[in-house]
Amino acid sequence: MPLKTIEGTFIAPQGKYALVVGRFNSFVVESLVSGAVDALVRHGVSENDITIIRAPGAFEIPLVAQKVAQQGEYDAIIALGAVIRGGTPHFEYVAGECTKGLAQVSMEFGVPVAFGVLTVDSIEQAIERSGTKAGNKGAEAALSALEMVSLLSQLEAK
């Protein structure tokens, strides 16, 4: 007898999705946004069910995501941004707090928060992860959101 397996799919066209986007490093972030929107639309989500909400930077994304989750209007939140390491400890603070804050929002409100915030050592790595050699992490985050919406709906139906 096979083991029972529950897993999400990339088909959740009825969902509403909020993209919470940090504007800092916009030359990279806009590629993440394009990748996320394209992935959602290719998997059946209407553009009318996608809202882009812009925050100043990655550090502010968790608070905006929290407010979005509180509204209860969206099935998933996709956080997009880019934190590029510099010569000071600033990178660790911003990347760490953004990560912790987004995880907290997801757990507190039971809403999937897909992590598409690049935390990289160089501009070259950011460019690679926003649509060139290493794929588009915005598109990957959107697919994670779709899968989580599908998975949670199955778990809630049980």
From Swiss-Prot:
Belongs to the DMRL synthase family. InterPro entries: LS, LS/RS, LS/RS_sf. The active site is at residue 90. Catalyzes the formation of 6,7-dimethyl-8-ribityllumazine by condensation of 5-amino-6-(D-ribitylamino)uracil with 3,4-dihydroxy-2-butanone 4-phosphate. This is the penultimate step in the biosynthesis of riboflavin. One of its GO terms (molecular function) is 6,7-dimethyl-8-ribityllumazine synthase activity. Pfam families: DMRL_synthase. One of its GO terms (biological process) is riboflavin biosynthetic process. It catalyses: (2S)-2-hydroxy-3-oxobutyl phosphate + 5-amino-6-(D-ribitylamino)uracil = 6,7-dimethyl-8-(1-D-ribityl)lumazine + phosphate + 2 H2O + H(+). Its EC number is 2.5.1.78. (2S)-2-hydroxy-3-oxobutyl phosphate binds at residues 87-88, 129. 5-amino-6-(D-ribitylamino)uracil binds at residues 24, 58-60, 82-84, 115. One of its GO terms (cellular component) is riboflavin synthase complex. It comes from the Bacteria. Disulfide bonds: none annotated. Pathway: Cofactor biosynthesis; riboflavin biosynthesis; riboflavin from 2-hydroxy-3-oxobutyl phosphate and 5-amino-6-(D-ribitylamino)uracil: step 1/2. Forms an icosahedral capsid composed of 60 subunits, arranged as a dodecamer of pentamers. Keywords: Riboflavin biosynthesis, Transferase. This is 6,7-dimethyl-8-ribityllumazine synthase.
